[in-house]
Amino acid sequence: MNSVTTSTIGRLAFGVSRLSAVTNVAGAVRHASTHPTTAIPKPTTAVLKTSPLAEETAVELKSPSRLQLKSEPGNKGNPKGHGDRIWAFHHIEQGQVIYSTKPVISHQHLIRQQPFTGKNLVPRKIRKDYWRPLAMIELAGKDQGAVGRSVYQKLREFKKRHELDWANEAEEGRKLMHKSKRERGQELNDQKPNSVADMAAVLAGAGKGNLMWQVSRLGSSSELVGEIKKASGAVEKGAVVDVKRQLRRATVYWTNEQDKFHAREWSDNVSHEVGIPGEAEKKRMPIRMSSE
């Protein structure tokens, strides 16, 4: 039978006794403590000699006028000119559209504006060889940043509705429901025609709280609310209301002039130009072909 020998029991007992002896000599095990073992020296006040120029600089930095950005009236925190222009970029292969208040786009724009439409259908990063400028919206007049940011907000809202609320569209919704997941994702990615139509609608005053309307040209606030509701309902039905005297003027610069025909109609307050300002000045590296 399996039995434990006397020598094994002796060794185990000897080990326990040795451990007990060490514990008795060293004392009880000290638990961890959050208090520092050494005293932390208190900070001493040092006398520094400063020059008169350094003292004047410190006084200027403490002044709130030095730290305040040059912002527009009533829009604190936004630098001057922010929102006067709105850029739209599109993916030349998949047709996705990204809006920006700057002439460049980053990966953050892609994360915030592009929803998940399917596996391997969302770009992982911004590649300059795939993204091209679609159009640039410029508002007429000075200090139109608040109006531009309102237009930017409406464009993003309409784009989000096209991508996530497509089932409410009777005809288009039925077409997408009968397609596979990948085909449906490809259709949802192609937002270029919808984005052009959204530009025409937003610049025509569509959307609640759209600042494209000039309040000063209307008789009363109730009249303004009525005109906004009228224009919003007409745009939803596919029409554009002629509100030339009630809308701010805007100019749309196109990379390709044919893209503007994706919209059914443009309001009279919008003018169109070919060529985005600043694109022609960019230096392009010449393509060198081998003689072989």
Curated annotation (Swiss-Prot):
InterPro entries, per database record: Ribosomal_mL67
Domain of life: Eukaryota
Region (Disordered): 59-83
Subcellular location: Mitochondrion
Main location: mitochondrion
Keywords tagged on the record: Mitochondrion, Ribonucleoprotein, Ribosomal protein, Transcription, Transcription regulation
Family: Belongs to the mitochondrion-specific ribosomal protein mL67 family.
Reported function: Component of the mitochondrial ribosome (mitoribosome), a dedicated translation machinery responsible for the synthesis of mitochondrial genome-encoded proteins, including at least some of the essential transmembrane subunits of the mitochondrial respiratory chain. The mitoribosomes are attached to the mitochondrial inner membrane and translation products are cotranslationally integrated into the membrane. mL67/MHR1 also has extraribosomal functions, being involved in regulation of mitochondrial DNA recombination, maintenance and repair, and generation of homoplasmic cells.
Subunit structure: Component of the mitochondrial large ribosomal subunit (mt-LSU). Mature N.crassa 74S mitochondrial ribosomes consist of a small (37S) and a large (54S) subunit. The 37S small subunit contains a 16S ribosomal RNA (16S mt-rRNA) and 32 different proteins. The 54S large subunit contains a 23S rRNA (23S mt-rRNA) and 42 different proteins.
The protein, known as: Large ribosomal subunit protein mL67
Lineage: Eukaryota, Fungi, Dikarya, Ascomycota, Pezizomycotina
